Amino acid sequence: MALVIGLTGGIASGKTTVANLFQQHFAIDIVDADIVARQVVAPGSAGLAAIVDHFGADILTCEGELDRGQLRQRIFAHSEEKQWLNALLHPMIRRKMIEDLAQVSSPYALLVVPLLVENQLQTLCDRVLVVDVEEKTQLQRTMDRDSVDEQQVRAILKAQASRHERLALADDVIKNESKDQDLLQQITDLHQKYLAMSKQNR
């Protein structure tokens, strides 16, 4: 199997931008946990069938897809329902990510997991790459991007692993603080490093 680089970072750190640059410039395969999480509850999936069985058919939209807004309301009000949902979906997501990583054709793969530290998914990775920004940058970017107030962003930050916790697990770090920072140069340097490591990994 290809060398697996776990890519993570806090909200608005620029994970997607970094992953896209690896893909666009170096044709690196990406397995994205957010996409996998949607796939395991797609119409016709075992995940969606189990959710409907548990919550009832009114958890679906008219098109037969998962009504995420309604599901959020249900689990927000009842912590035991959230625990049930996590116990159902986390193993499914993990299995699907492992299956997808086994299909990788590039010398190494990026496993993009926003909550990699929180869900202890670093066990799936050979190295952990953290996209790092200061908290004030996260606050401003998220408020600008999502039109939310500072209090809401701080609540999200509080629910995530701290910057210190992420950096403590990092093998590599990309600084993504300012718009003019040379992101591509940092990525190019890491790409060369990962290529060399992937040859040793064979």
From Swiss-Prot:
ATP binds at A12, S13, G14, K15, T16, T17. Pathway: Cofactor biosynthesis; coenzyme A biosynthesis; CoA from (R)-pantothenate: step 5/5. The keyword Ribosomal protein does not apply. Keywords: ATP-binding, Coenzyme A biosynthesis, Cytoplasm, Kinase, Nucleotide-binding, Transferase. HAMAP family: Dephospho_CoA_kinase (MF_00376). The lineage of its organism: Bacteria, Pseudomonadati, Pseudomonadota, Gammaproteobacteria, Vibrionales. This is Dephospho-CoA kinase. It is found in: Cytoplasm. PROSITE patterns: DPCK. Residues 4-201 form the DPCK domain. The keyword rRNA processing does not apply. Gene3D superfamilies: P-loop containing nucleotide triphosphate hydrolases. Its EC number is 2.7.1.24. One of its GO terms (molecular function) is dephospho-CoA kinase activity. Pfam families: CoaE. GO terms for cellular component: cytoplasm. InterPro entries: Depp_CoAkinase (IPR001977), P-loop_NTPase (IPR027417). GO terms for biological process: coenzyme A biosynthetic process. It comes from the Bacteria. Catalyzes the phosphorylation of the 3'-hydroxyl group of dephosphocoenzyme A to form coenzyme A. Belongs to the CoaE family. It catalyses: 3'-dephospho-CoA + ATP = ADP + CoA + H(+).
